[in-house]
Amino acid sequence: MKFFIPSHKRSNLLMKYTLGCLINYGIKKDDIFIFVDFSQEEEYKKICGEHANIIGFNDTGIGSARYYIQLFAQDKQIEYGFILDDDLQVLLYKSEKAPKGWWHNKYIKDAETAQKYLSKMEDDCLARSEILVGLTPRRVMHLDKPDVFSNGHPYGFYWLNFKKLKDLDIWYDHNMDHFEDYDITFQLLETGYNTKLYRDLGFSSFVIGTLEGGCYNNYQTKDLLSKARMLELRYQNIGVKLIEREIKNKSGQNNLSFKIKWIKKKSILQQEDFLGSITKKVVD
């Protein structure tokens, strides 16, 4: 099992959190790859190089790290692995005693338990011949069944296979929100349209949102808009409209959420509730 960690000017934080976590769980250096801009390569080698492989690349902004990780994995013939944020603190797993439909998570504190669950995930991945991608903005990584879309937890960890999406029933009635990782979100949009997956399942909208950070960053917002326009130009029969929405959280603060709605060129889809029944309300 390989671990890919894109990072930017946070070598000390990475060493304290994600890398420290992986070290505690007994993950070896050969399985950890940290991706940083060429200008930061020496700094990361000094702070983290003893425990991880530091890979320099030309960081051009949002999405470039994960795109480069994909190229790197293809070149090294690595078929699966985790992509982690650099502030990961702990692994979680679903309690076997949890009632059906409930998600009682337990913290993994020791290396033996971590290795047990990571090994199971690796076996599941091999059995499905899929690519494993993890996104962990809430500083935890869920180790749940790979056929479950982190139900009930919008900041979960999940499995994607861009070549062939299997077990389509898992996409029904699940939150299609995607947080922070806009590049993969748009890959999903393209993959979904190309395979008619989302259209066949009745998806007429897609949500990109965040409760912390993310969309508050202006250049990320502009990047979303430019990608939306790019998609609109790419497909002659379908357009993409990006709609900004504010959500009040429990503390009364505004959170930005972005909705992408597929729009037919001659007949705009009429749907008052753009999110419909396929999404859950995003709250703290």
Q: Where in this protein do the model-derived segments appear?
A:
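Short loop->beta transition adjacent to catalytic acidic/histidine clusters or analogous donor-positioning motifs
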Residues: 1-2, 23-34, 52
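A structural signal for short, well-ordered beta-strand segments and their strand-loop junctions
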Residues: 34, 80-84, 131-136, 195-199, ...
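Short acidic, S/G/P-rich loop/turn micro-motifs used as interaction or catalytic elements
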Residues: 8-13, 41, 88-91, 109, ...
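C-terminal catalytic/acceptor-binding lobe
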Residues: 1, 10-14, 176-178, 182-284
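A short acidic (Asp/Glu
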Residues: 15-17, 43-47, 92-95, 143-148, ...
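Active-site-proximal specificity loops/subdomain of glycosyltransferases
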Residues: 35-84, 89-104
